[in-house]
C-alpha cells in the first residue's frame, strides 16, 4: 500500500513541500530565516487576533482599550508585547533573509525574488498601519507625516491624501480603515508567502556555493526540519527574553502619551526598522525627491538581478564583492542610526553621504567590481 502522505491530495502538497522535498546538502543556517519568517507570521496573526478581540478602533477609546488589554485582560500585557516585539523579530529575520539572498545570489530566481520584494512592501505597510493603532503621540504624528508624503505626488497628491485620511486630517475614519487593512493584510501576506514557496520549489533552493546542487540532494525531513526547529527555539528564546525583561526597549516613550493633534512631539520618528528609509527620505531637501528616494531605497531590490554582472552566482568566492557587501551593511546601520537622530549638524551631512553611498554601491560600484573580478579570473 502506498503511503497516505504521497497519495492524499492535501497531504501530498505538504509532503512535497516539507517532507520529501529534495534540498541541497550544504545549505547553512542563513537558510533558516524563511521558516523563521513563517513562524513570525503565525505568531503575529495569532497574537493580533486576540488583541483584536479587545481593541476598539475609535479615536476616543483606542488608547484606553490598549491600556485595558495590558491591565485587565488575562495575560493581555503578554499578548500585546509579543505582538509589538514580534514585529521587531519579523523585521530582523526579513533583513537577514534579504541579506542572505543578496550575498548568495538567490535573486537569480526572478519570480521568487520579485514576490519577496512584494512581500517586503506588504509587511512594511502592515507594520506602519499597526503602529498607528494604539493612538499614542508617535502613532498619530507618524501617520500624519508619512501619509502627508503622498501630497508630493503632482496634480493628484492632496486629493489622494484626503481620500486616504477620509477627511481633512488623520482622524476616526483613518484609524478605522487602518485597523481594517492591518487585519486583512497578514492573510494576504500568508497567501503571497505560499506563492513565494511555490516558485521556490519550481527551481529548488540555492546554496552557499551558488553552483547546481542537483548531484547532491538530501530529503528535507528529518535533516532540515530538525535544523529549523533549532532556529525556531532560538527565535522564541530571543523574543520571550525581550518581552519578559525589556518589552519597551525598541518602542518610543512618546507613544505612552495619548494622541494630541495640538501638540507635536519634538522628534517624530518611526519604529527602528524604518529608520534607514526615513534617513534617506530626510537627506533630500526636496519633498518629491525625498519620497522617490524613499520608495526607490526598497524598490531597488527589484532591479538587482539586472545588475548582476559576475560570472559567479554567489559572493562566496569573490572577496572584493564581499568587502562591498559588508560596507553596504555598515552603511545601512549608519542610516538606521541617523534616522533616529535630530535634523542638525553633523547628522544631516552624514545622512546625505550614507544615502548617496547606498545607491552608488548597489547601482555602480558593485556591478563594476563584479566585472573586475571576472577579468582577474580571466573569465
UniProtKB/Swiss-Prot annotation:
In the bilayer, the protein is annotated as:
Multi-pass membrane protein
The cofactors named for this UniProt entry are:
heme b
Q: Transmembrane region positions?
A: 33-53, 77-98, 113-133, 178-198, 226-246, 288-308, 320-340, 347-367
User: Where is the protein localized?
Assistant: Mitochondrion inner membrane
Q: What GO molecular-function term can you cite, just one?
A: metal ion binding
Q: Which Gene Ontology cellular-component terms appear in the entry?
A: mitochondrial inner membrane; respiratory chain complex III
Question: What keywords were assigned to this record?
Answer: Electron transport, Heme, Iron, Membrane, Metal-binding, Mitochondrion, Mitochondrion inner membrane, Respiratory chain, Transmembrane, Transmembrane helix, Transport, Ubiquinone
Pfam families named in the record: Cytochrom_B_C, Cytochrome_B
**Binding site residues for a ubiquinone:** 201
- Among its keywords, does the record have Magnesium? no
Task: Give binding positions for heme b b562.
Answer: 83, 182
Q: What is its main location?
A: mitochondrion
Q: Where does heme b b566 bind?
A: 97, 196
Q: Which PANTHER family match?
A: CYTOCHROME B
Task performed by this protein: Component of the ubiquinol-cytochrome c reductase complex (complex III or cytochrome b-c1 complex) that is part of the mitochondrial respiratory chain. The b-c1 complex mediates electron transfer from ubiquinol to cytochrome c. Contributes to the generation of a proton gradient across the mitochondrial membrane that is then used for ATP synthesis.
Q: How does it assemble?
A: The cytochrome bc1 complex contains 11 subunits: 3 respiratory subunits (MT-CYB, CYC1 and UQCRFS1), 2 core proteins (UQCRC1 and UQCRC2) and 6 low-molecular weight proteins (UQCRH/QCR6, UQCRB/QCR7, UQCRQ/QCR8, UQCR10/QCR9, UQCR11/QCR10 and a cleavage product of UQCRFS1). This cytochrome bc1 complex then forms a dimer.
The record's comment on protein family reads:
Belongs to the cytochrome b family.
Q: What else is known?
A: Heme 1 (or BL or b562) is low-potential and absorbs at about 562 nm, and heme 2 (or BH or b566) is high-potential and absorbs at about 566 nm.
Which protein, by its recorded name, is this? Answer: Cytochrome b
Q: What is the organism field in this record?
A: Sorex cylindricauda
Encoding gene (name): MT-CYB
